[in-house]
Amino acid sequence: MLLEAVRTGYENALTSDIWTMELANRSFKAHVDNMVLDMAARLVLVNMLADDKHIALSDSELADCTARADAFYDEHSEDIAYIKKDELEKLFAMMVLSDKVYDELTRSVDTQVSVDEARVIRIQYIYSDKSGDASSKVEKLEKALEEFQAGEDFTALVSKYSDIPDYTAQIGRGELEKSFEDAAFNLDAGQISDIVSCTNGWYLIYCIDDNVTGKAESQIESIIQRRRNEQFEKHLGDFSDGVELIIDDRQWEKLSSQE
């Protein structure tokens, strides 16, 4: 059912032509099918984690799952004739339990976010990629820095020196590479950074606004959600180290070959 639902969603959004497309030298269909297999394996793994952590659905939660599954089955029975009602009930229960495991294991996450951590800033940057001679790439940014300090407009310098046309961004903490982030958040509005080395190249960063108004609340929510995700993935990763899931390749091939 997961496979059919995901396939249908993609087809409704992008038309049936997507199945003739290729993505990274692999058919889009194979890409979607493998994604669904990963989703199914993760669902099973999280339910195993629930058992390990002694987390279970209450009687009322199970009854609600059954009612929702039955209602869905009755409404869509012609479209999902390939699945039995009790199998659908089990799938609904597994998904709800997966959500409950997430909530239970992330309940202790620290929800305190400092004013500085919640800041969102608006920046411009000049980027020099790592192709070619590194010293000449860095020298190019040194020239840009000298010209800015001599009074040249930063936007004009972007057009003159940057390897990419995009040069403006609005960022929060934890979104970009640490060296870039540290340099950007240490700037006050109107200041420019030294040359920043990142894994994909070098940057000069100019701060337009060091605290964009109206963004703190959504940024706090984003930071807390990221903390929850990190904590849950730590639990799941520690548990999965001792688990081996065996996929029945013949059954999966049979299922995924169905149109």
Language model region names:
Residues M1-I83:
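N-terminal targeting/tethering segments
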Residues K143-F180, D209, G214-K215:
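Peptidyl-prolyl cis-trans isomerase
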Residues S77-S136, E175-E259:
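PPIase-associated folding chaperone regions across multiple families
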Residues Y10, A40, V44, M48-L57, ...:
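Sec/Tat-exported extracytoplasmic proteins
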Residues K29, D33, L37-D38, R42, ...:
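Hydrophobic (often cysteine-bearing) scaffold residues that line and stabilize catalytic clefts
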Residues A63, V138-E142:
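Generic alpha-helical structural signal
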Residues D59-E61, Y167, S193:
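A generic structural-conservation signal
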